[in-house]
Structure formats: C-alpha cells, structure tokens
Amino acid sequence: MAAAPRACKGHGRPLPVLLLLLLLALPPLGGPPGAAAYFPEERWSPESPLQAPRVLIALLARNAAHALPATLGALERLRHPRERTALWVATDHNADNTSAVLREWLVAVKGLYHSVEWRPSEEPRSYPDEEGPKHWSDSRYEHVMKLRQAALKSARDMWADYILFVDADNLILNPDTLTLLIAENKTVVAPMLDSRAAYSNFWCGMTSQGYYKRTPAYIPIRKRERRGCFAVPMVHSTFLIDLRKAASRNLAFYPPHPDYTWSFDDIIVFAFSCKQAEVQMYVCNKEVYGFLPVPLRSHSTLQDEAESFMHVQLEVMVKHPPSEPSRFISVPTKTPDKMGFDEVFMINLKRRQDRRERMLRALEEQEIACRLVEAVDGKAMNTSQVEALGIQMLPGYRDPYHGRPLTKGELGCFLSHYNIWKEVVDRGLQKSLVFEDDLRFEIFFKRRLMNLMQDVEREGLDWDLIYVGRKRMQVEHPEKAVPRVRNLVEADYSYWTLAYVISLQGARKLLAARPLSKMLPVDEFLPVMFDKHPVSEYKAHFSPRDLRAFSVEPLLIYPTHYTGDDGYVSDTETSVVWNNEHVKTDWDRAKSQKMREQQALSREAKNSDVLQSPLDSAARDEL
C-alpha cells in the first residue's frame, strides 16, 4: 500500500491552509486580545478608561474685584474636564463690585461646568466689629468658617471626589496643578504658592497654642532647595481635600472641635480638626504652581490690597508669562500717566524683544506711560563708528573686578543714557524718570515714588539725580539721611543705572563734563560726577564734580537677575573690547562680581536714620 505524500515534501498543501486558519483566528495586529475571534460570539470590545474624578472648586471672595479677572482666568485654564467640575462661589460684605464681577463670570460659564452654586450677599458691607476691610474680627472668622463648612457639605452631598479651596487672590498658573495634587493621593494637600518674599501658604512649625513657629525646615522648602511633598502642621489659602478617604468624614471647618482652645482663626481651627482626625497635611513644591500676595496689615486700605495683588502679577512676569484675565469678564480700561514727570524713558535693545514686552506690560499694569528708547547696540558698532563719535576711553581705566578695558556693551549702555541726557536738555525737561529693561518693581512702586517727589518739591530740595534702583558699594558707614524728606539719603559710591530720576540741571552737568572723550562705564561715571568715586585718578579728569545725587531708601527697583541666576544675561559684561572687535570679553558669568546681589549690611552701616513712610511698613514681609 502506497504511503501518503508528506506535506513537508511539497506533495499537497495542508500546512499553508492550517496557517491561514490560525491567522484568521488571531486579533488584528496591535489590537487588544479577544477583540476579534473566529466565532462572532467570541469577540468583545476593550474596557473604556475611567472618567475624570468629580471636583468641586470652592471660591470665597470679599472686596476682590481687582483680583478676580486674573484668578478666574487661571481657574478656567486648569486641565480638568469642566463637565466633571462643579463651582461653589460665595461673596459678601463687599465695598467694591466683587458681586457684579462674579455674577458676570458665572452667567457666562455656567453652561461649561457640571453645576454652579452661587451664594451672594449684598448687605451688610462690613462687619460690626471690624476696624477696616483688612481687619479680621471674630465675626469675620466665624462667617468664613461657616462658608467653608457649607462648601464642604455641598461637595459631600453631590458625592464629589475632591474639593479644591482657592482664595480669591491666589493665582494657580500651572494648568496641571489639580491633576498633580490628585496624583499625590493625600487626604489634605496644598500646592506651595510663591510670593515676593518668604511668605507662602504653609507652616513648618506650630506652637503649643497653635501659632506660627519659625523652624529651620521652612526656608529650604520655600526656596525649593528641597523638593517633594512634605508633612506640615498647616496649609491654607489653596488646598485639596480627598473626600474619598474615610478620614475626611471627620474634617470640619465649623463648629470648632469640642476640645479646641486655641485662637479663633479659621486656618488654625481647620488645622486642629485635621490633627484630631489624624489627617496629615502636606505641601508640595515639586513645581511652580502659582502665586499669592503677602498679607497686609489690618489698617491697610482696599487701594493697598489692589496694588499688592498687582505686584503679584508683576512678580509673575519676571520669570513666567503674564497672568491673563478671564475672557468672560469685562476688564476696566487702564489710563497710563507719567507720574508727574515731564517724561518717562524706557531703554531697550531692539534685539531684546522679551525684555521689551515684559517691561511694557509691567508699566501698563501700573498705569505708567513711557517713551520707548531704542538702546545703542554697542556690539553692532565698528571701530570707525566709534572713532566718528570722538569716543576715547578714560586713560588708565580698568574694570575693578577683571582688570579689563571698557567693553562694546558698556559703550552702548553709556551712549544710550547719554542720548537721553541730550534729549532732556534739548526738550528742556525739568524732571524725567529713566528705566532700563532688566528690572523688577517693589510693591507700591508708583505711589511711593510719587510721594517721594512730592516731599522733594515741598522741601525745595536742590537735586540733580535720584537713584531709584542701585547697588550700594560703600558699606562701611551709613549714608546721610535727608531732613524732612521721607525715604531719601545722599548717595555714596554706587553701581547700576537700573532706574533714576534726572533733572534738567543734572543732565546739563553730565553733558558739560564731555564724557565721550574720556569714557568709562556709566555707573562709574555718575559717582565720579558727585565726587564719591574711590579712585582719585578717575576723578582728576573731571571738574567740577558737583552733581547733587541722592538715593531712594529703601530702594524701589531691583534687577530681575543676579550673577549665577538661571536666565542671567549681560549685554555689557559679555562683549568685546571697545576699540577692537577681535578681543572677546566673554568672562565667566558665574564669577562676575558687578551683578552680584547687594551684600548684607552691618547694623552700623544701615541707613537707619532715614524717615520712613507708612507704605514702607505695609510692604514688609509678615515672616
């Protein structure tokens, strides 16, 4: 009997047929297992992902019309599905139009979010036991605690997974903040918010009576020298509660716990509630999440509060994009002015568009009108152009830190200021304000400078130049305070020309010195002209040296960056030698001394005799 032919020998094709059947039974390439099968009844669809958690955002606002456009705009940009987000908003005791702003926004967005609960109260406009709108009386504390408790109850009643509390002046600029906090899987967790000073929305220590306690752990966390999520005794202002956690059922804002004996303060009452429920609070500083203002004193005004929040927006722009307002709110039109000066100049290199845009926005926020002056780009000047202007370096000049001659960048900087002095004289401008473009403003800048100039005029002070921002180089003894004028001292040897006020008389004196024929950096030239430069050889080339120079104290302007900071760029120090474009001067920026932060002054050298204004104390950091 003949044997059947073997398939492997090619006699017949049973193997390919079997392979084909097997391939048909397999799911499509890249498809999930079981998504396809030989028999229709064996096919099934993959499971869909989980829906985003349900979140209720609770916002309490009082006298916050100035902050709400930016705060609400930031909330709109949170990357969490709006259909899974509910809004709970309350406002009362307002002396401004907070209710109208919130109503306009809620009407516009109510169809975008899962639900909206709106709790306005138009009357009364103040608490009976408060001394002013910034004073926290017992009745105000109690009312806020009741509102937070009501928001918490609403979240529980709607079976929300989380509740996010946000103060009306807190800017959550990181759109992933909510997602990142949820991922931490903590019962109570806060994003660390930045401010202009050491203040933030957490404590690292608490006394036995429930008050704030300084600890060595605070500053490393606040400065992000240590990064992570840290167990702390207190978080406030902006924080997330995970309502899925069993322990969250024992948390309450009001009434205070039966064992509570500490100060009647809403944040301390809630911290005690967490402690009694054995719920640990956490603060996370892994990323930059947002910003908040430093609290003002109880006697501060609504104007102080509005300007304080505006300063938060200015601080944001130093290293981040500006905080844009909600597109659903009508923002009041700004009316810039020149602060009483004949002209406000802002110097900017054309190729530094980022600085120009930031400074123009910062001035607009403060309602300061300026004239943009295109800076002289020293790096773009060739030797023949320098010679055509009759420029010669001061004989014997060497940079005090590197021993190098003048750079093209320093030459361009000098010419930029020189051209402004010429314009001041040509136009007969009695007093002008000059800004460079790499500066940051102190809080209440506009009001404090205007008050200072009013004092100067009232006293009839004979002045030529007033530093608004500088680096004080003479640190052995204090500078002389000006009698009867607040916040002003006679300037000693100083660096930097970040911002200054110049008079017509002062500009004439600077031009009369014919500085182009014996040039040195502009911030070395000015101390020579008011006879405070420590190098007598430099001073010998200029006479008279009778510039009447003063300085604001405390300063109202500081640099945006110092040597070694991320983003530090120098257009003056990193350049080429003034008369030879082939000799580079790109020094090690990390070792540059000129742009280092002002060194700490000894107690004996501080300008402690200067007359202070009320705004100075309001501007101090609470910590």
Swiss-Prot record:
Domain of life, source organism: Eukaryota
Gene3D superfamilies assigned: Spore Coat Polysaccharide Biosynthesis Protein SpsA, Chain A (3.90.550.10)
Positions of short motif Prevents secretion from ER: 620-623
Record-linked SUPFAM superfamilies: Nucleotide-diphospho-sugar transferases (SSF53448)
Gene Ontology BP annotations: positive regulation of collagen fibril organization
EC number: 2.4.1.50
Location within or outside the cell: Endoplasmic reticulum lumen
Keywords, ordered alphabetically: Endoplasmic reticulum, Glycoprotein, Glycosyltransferase, Signal, Transferase
Endpoints of the signal sequence: 1-30
Modifications the protein undergoes after translation, according to the UniProt entry: N-glycosylated.
Glycosylation sites: N97, N185, N382
GO terms of molecular function: procollagen galactosyltransferase activity
Feature: compositional bias, Basic and acidic residues: 589-607
Region (Disordered): 589-623
Known catalytic reactions: (5R)-5-hydroxy-L-lysyl-[collagen] + UDP-alpha-D-galactose = (5R)-5-O-(beta-D-galactosyl)-5-hydroxy-L-lysyl-[collagen] + UDP + H(+)
Keyword Magnesium: no
Record's GO cellular component terms: endoplasmic reticulum lumen
Family stated for the protein in its record: Belongs to the glycosyltransferase 25 family.
UniProt function note: Beta-galactosyltransferase that transfers beta-galactose to hydroxylysine residues of type I collagen. By acting on collagen glycosylation, facilitates the formation of collagen triple helix. Also involved in the biosynthesis of collagen type IV.
Record protein name field: Procollagen galactosyltransferase 1
The species this protein was found in: Bos taurus
Taxonomic lineage from the root: Eukaryota, Metazoa, Chordata, Craniata, Vertebrata
Gene name of the record: COLGALT1
